[in-house]
Regions:
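Hydrophobic helix-and-loop "lid/oligomerization" segment in the mid-to-C-terminal part
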Residues: 2-115, 135, 187-411, 418-425, ...
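Short alpha-helices
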Residues: 73, 150-191, 197-209
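Histidine/acidic-residue-rich, glycine-tolerant segments that coordinate divalent metal ions
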Residues: 112, 119-172
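Short, acidic/hydrophobic/Gly-rich beta-strand patch recurrent on exposed beta strands
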Residues: 329, 487-492, 501, 536-539
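Short beta-strand micro-motifs in enzyme catalytic cores
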Residues: 364, 397, 484-488, 532-534
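OB-fold single-stranded nucleic acid-binding module
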Residues: 405-411, 513-544
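Accessory interdomain/linker segments of ATP-dependent helicases and helicase-like nucleic-acid enzymes
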Residues: 437-498
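Beta-strand/loop nucleic-acid-binding surfaces
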Residues: 493-511
Length: 544
């Protein structure tokens, strides 16, 4: 077996048919009947009425990339279907906050809405939808988030998380559900012939990758073909944003969406308003697209600077909490839109669960990131009598509490951690190799070309990781303005050498020449001044 075949086998792809299906996703074979989703029939019927009567539709999106992508999908498709009046409302994180709110419903009423179509939100907005109804505004919900025992009082609630339906795949993102609505409308309205909906897959791919849903079944095919659509550069906004981000459209992959386009789009909603990102997605000409993209780039640079400041301040606090098993850091000067990213970076550095809390007068709001067997949501529940509200899931949660109760909250979540008597939690943060190797003989361009066939990478299909079980450190080079990056050259048992690079490397990566080590890495190709070289993206290193 070749190394590539071993990697495929490690992913459970042991037969020729399974490999073929995985490496060449078939859009048609996973284009499941949209009418199997709950309430899709009701949603289509209500939209047909709006179409026939020329009603004003307002698409109510979320300010994250999934919500923005879903909003852009419906704006594009509804235009082609010939809906007479269609607008969009994206809430501001710092004004309306997350989800539907009463104030936001008032703003939508002032836009003249007869019908609200939510995307990526709405399943838990019972009171707000009831309020809209009292104002004479119907609501069609399209969403993918968790649901309550009773559906919202909307005309329709299309969400694969609702029980009792026969749709075969439940892990669609908001953009994916919006796309299913488009597919359903195609069967009943003219304007977007069968097959032409595939030109929307660039937006579906963007939402799917950035919302970190499982890249399997329909999601994998949508992203696979969505990347092909992106390469065609039919959307001026995404073409301009790729240019600003330095992404070659012919080589665009899922990593570029998650780490190139995604952060730039998110910066708008984190610092000012996500409307800038929607303006980019819906730009109709090159100049408009470039202006919107440059605005996103400017905000992203500002976001990075703010993020670095918060991280440094949080580290100063965390350095004085060496005995705490859960880090709870807080300040009145931290931007609420950025603290979630900082929480993730603190977990990486300190290898502990983290709550980062921004104070706003008497009330404070925080984000949590965790790992392993310590559930952030369970920790919030353990402090239920201390907080105002909170929730989430194992890896991430949010919490709102009185500022004066932060110290009590810190004590409570640490007591909760101790009560669990957890062991070896840090092991969950270590990379897990798909295959172990004892030499570098197959680490070449052919392998990297083959690994690219496994794209798109993301949740449920991570980039393959290899572990060299024993190698000798030939050289160590510190890089970067502060020596924060490292380039190791490792030699295998056959005297074959491979360079490995790690950015912002922890101190244990800086080994001594002659050390015998094991290393976890991802093979990559480095292109510099027209020259190609195979190297490794170093993820972890330990003594043999």
């Amino acid at each position: 077996m070749t190394l590539f075949e071993k990697i495929l086998a490690a992913r459970g792809l042991t037969t020729r048919a399974a490999r073929e299906e995985f490496l060449h996703p078939n859009y048609a074979s996973v284009k499941h009947d949209p009418f199997l989703l709950p309430d899709m029939r009701k949603a289509v019927d209500r939209l047909k009425k709006a179409h026939a009567e020329g009603e004003k539709i307002v698409i109510y999106g979320d300010y994250d990339i999934d919500g923005l992508s879903a909003t852009a999908i419906l704006l594009d498709a509804f235009g082609k279907f010939g809906f007479k009046e269609v607008g969009a409302f994206i809430p501001n994180r710092f004004v309306e906050g997350y989800g539907m709110t009463m104030g936001a419903v008032d703003k939508v009423r002032n836009m003249g809405a007869d019908l609200i179509v939510t995307v990526d939100t709405g399943s838990l907005c019972h009171a707000e939808i009831e309020y809209a109804s009292s104002l004479g505004i119907d609501t069609v919900v399209t969403d993918h988030h968790n649901v309550a025992e009773t559906p919202p009082p909307s005309v329709a609630a299309v969400n694969p998380k609702f029980p009792g339906h026969k749709y075969p795949f439940r892990d669609l993102c908001g953009a994916g559900v919006a796309f299913k609505l488009v597919q359903a409308l195609q069967t009943e309205l003219a304007g977007l012939p069968d097959g032409y909906e595939k030109w929307l897959l660039d937006l579906v791919a963007l939402g799917t990758v950035c919302d970190i849903v499982t890249l399997a079944d329909e999601n994998r095919a949508n992203v696979y073909w969505g990347l092909e659509v992106l390469k065609k550069q039919r959307r001026p906004g995404l073409k301009a944003l790729m240019s600003v981000a330095g992404i070659d459209p012919e080589k665009v992959n899922a990593r570029h969406l998650g780490f190139g386009l995604g952060p730039r789009m998110n910066a708008a909603g984190r610092l000012e308003t996500a409307q800038y990102a929607l303006d980019m997605l819906t730009a109709s000409d090159r100049l408009e697209a470039l202006e919107a993209s440059e605005k996103l780039e400017e905000l992203n640079i500002k976001r990075r600077s703010i993020q670095d400041e918060i991280f440094d301040e949080a580290c100063q606090q965390a350095d004085n909490m060496t005995d705490d098993r859960v880090l709870v850091v807080n300040s009145g000067n931290w931007n609420h839109g950025v603290i979630g990213i900082v929480a993730s970076k603190l977990v990486e550095k300190y290898k502990k669960p983290v709550f980062i809390i921004g104070e706003r007068g008497d009330e404070a709001t925080g984000s949590a990131r965790s790992f392993g067997d310590f559930s952030a949501a369970d920790a919030v529940r353990a402090a239920d009598d201390i907080i105002i509200k909170g929730g989430g899931h194992g890896a991430a949660a949010g919490v709102t509490l009185a500022t004066e109760r932060i110290d009590d909250f810190r004590r409570r979540v640490n007591e909760f951690y101790d009560s669990l008597q957890l062991k070896n939690q840090e092991l969950y943060l270590l990379p897990r190799a798909d295959v172990e190797i004892d030499d570098f003989s197959e680490i070449d361009e052919e392998l990297i070309d083959n690994l690219a066939k496994m794209e798109p990478f993301g949740n449920g299909n991570a980039e393959p990781i290899l572990k060299i079980t024993e190698a000798t450190v030939l050289s160590v080079r510190r890089m970067g303005a502060e020596g924060q990056h490292v380039k190791l050259t490792l030699r295998d048992k056959n005297d074959v050498a491979l360079q490995m690079l790690a950015f912002n490397a922890p101190e244990e990566f800086f080994r001594e020449v002659g050390d015998e080590v094991s290393a976890w890495f991802q093979p990559t190709v480095n292109e510099w001044q027209g020259m190609k070289s195979v190297e490794g993206r170093l993820l972890h290193v330990s003594g043999v």
